[in-house]
Amino acid sequence: MDNHNSSHQLYKKAMALVLAGGRGSRLYNLTDTRAKPAVYFGGKFRIIDFALSNCLNSGIRRIGVVTQYKSHSLLRHLQRGWGFLRGELNEFIDLLPAQQRVDEEHWYRGTADAVYQNIDILRSYGPEYVIVLAGDHIYKMDYSIMLRDHAQSGYKCTVGCVEIAKEEAYAFGIMGIDENRKITSFIEKPKKNAPTIPGTTDRCYASMGIYIFNSDYLYDLLEEDITNKESSHDFGKDIIPRVVSENQALAHPFSMSCVPRCEGIEPYWRDVGTIDAFWEANLDLAANMPELNIYDKDWPVWTAQEQLPPVKFVPDRNGNHGVITNTLASGGCIVLGSEISKSLMFSKVRVLAGCKIDQCVIMPEVVVGENCRLKKVVIDKGCDIPAGMVIGEDPIEDAKNFYRTDKGVVLVTKKMIDELKEK
C-alpha cells in the first residue's frame, strides 16, 4: 500500500460508530437525567465531545452515534453543536436511537446488539472499515494511525489498548499478546492471573473500547452472535473473544496514536466512570501543566458553543477582592469577592461573596450563596447552594445529606438540595 493511499484514502473508506447509549450507573445521580456520554466535563464540554473530536481531527467524517438511555440531553447537544458537517461532501453525524429496527421485542441488549440493530444503515453507506468507539472516555487519539495499522496488518480486527498497572486489571478487559501484537487471549475484568505485557510482570494491556473491523467480517460476526441464545451480545464479553479464537485480532497500543505522541510520557486516557475518577480527571485540567491539553490548536476539542458574556470577577459590596488560583471558568460566570482554588466552573455559575471553594467541579447554572465553604465537591447543574452551607468538611454530615465516596468526594444534586431545604 503506497503512502498516499495509506495516509489519505483510508479514512474515506471508514465509518465510525460511537456507542453512547450507556447509563453509567457508577456515576450515581449524575446520570439520573442524562446518559453518561452527555455528562459535562472540563468546564465546557460533554464527555462524548472527545471521541467525536478525535473523529473529525483524524479525518473520519462519516459518523453514527448510537443512543438509548435518557438520550434527550445528548441528542440536543449533538443537534446544536455538531450539525456543521457537510452532507454534500458525504460528511455526517447520524443519530441512531434504539428503535427496534430488526426486533420488535427488544431495545439494544448490549454493545454488539446496538451495532447489529443498525447493520442495514451501515451497509447502506458501504464502508470498507467500521470503527467502533466508546463514547464515554477522555483522551485524544489519531484514529487514522490506528486505521493504517489495521489495514497494513492483514488482521480482520484491531483493538485499541492502553497500558495499565496489573493491580487495576480487575476493572477492564485485559488482553494477552505475543511479540507481534497478535492478541492471544482476552479476559473481561479478571479477578486474578491477568495476562501481562511481554517483558513485564506488573503491566497489562487494557481494552480502550475501540475496535476497527473489516466491515464484512463484522457483519458476519454480528449476524452469528445474534442467533446465539447464550450470548450477552457484548463486544468485550462475546465478540472480541470470538475474534481472538479465530486468530484475527491485533492489539494497537495507545502510545502509537495518542495526541501528542511524546517519548517517555504516558499518554492520557481516563475512564471517568466513577465519581472519584470523574472528579480527578476534571481537576487534572486545573494543574499548571495539565497532561491533557485542551488548548491545542492542532487537535481542538469541539463542542456546542452557547453565546455568553465573558466571565467576571468583582469585589463584594465591602470592596473585598477574591483570590482565584488554578481555576477554569466558562462564559457567563460571575464571582464576587470569594476564594477559589483548583476548581472548574461551567457556564453561568454565580458565586456570591465570602465563599471559599477548593477542588470543586461546579456544573452550569449553579448559584453558590454567600459565605459557603466547599471542598472536594461535584455540584450538578442547576443547584442553588444556600448561604452559609459547608460541604466537604464533616464526613458524617456529608454522607447523611449527599453522596460521599470513600475518597471523600461529595456529589451534590438539585434533588438533594431541595430535600435538604425541606427538612
From Swiss-Prot:
InterPro entries: ADP-Glc_PPase, ADP_Glu_pyroP_CS, GlgC_bac, GlmU/GlgC-like_hexapep, NTP_transferase_dom, Nucleotide-diphossugar_trans, Trimer_LpxA-like_sf
Keyword tags: ATP-binding, Carbohydrate metabolism, Glycogen biosynthesis, Glycogen metabolism, Nucleotide-binding, Nucleotidyltransferase, Transferase
Gene: glgC
Binding residues for alpha-D-glucose 1-phosphate: Y108, G173, E188, K189, S207
Subunit relationships: Homotetramer.
Single Gene Ontology BP annotation: glycogen biosynthetic process
Pathway assigned in UniProt: Glycan biosynthesis; glycogen biosynthesis
SUPFAM superfamilies, per database record: Nucleotide-diphospho-sugar transferases, Trimeric LpxA-like enzymes
Substrates-to-products reaction catalysed: alpha-D-glucose 1-phosphate + ATP + H(+) = ADP-alpha-D-glucose + diphosphate
UniProt name for this protein: Glucose-1-phosphate adenylyltransferase
HAMAP family, alphabetized: GlgC
Enzyme Commission number, as recorded: 2.7.7.27
Organism from which the protein derives: Francisella tularensis subsp. tularensis (strain WY96-3418)
Pfam families xref list: Hexapep_GlmU, NTP_transferase
Purpose of the protein: Involved in the biosynthesis of ADP-glucose, a building block required for the elongation reactions to produce glycogen. Catalyzes the reaction between ATP and alpha-D-glucose 1-phosphate (G1P) to produce pyrophosphate and ADP-Glc.
Domain of life: Bacteria
UniProt-recorded Gene Ontology molecular function terms: ATP binding; glucose-1-phosphate adenylyltransferase activity
Matches recorded under PROSITE patterns: ADP_GLC_PYROPHOSPH_1, ADP_GLC_PYROPHOSPH_2, ADP_GLC_PYROPHOSPH_3
Root EC class: transferase
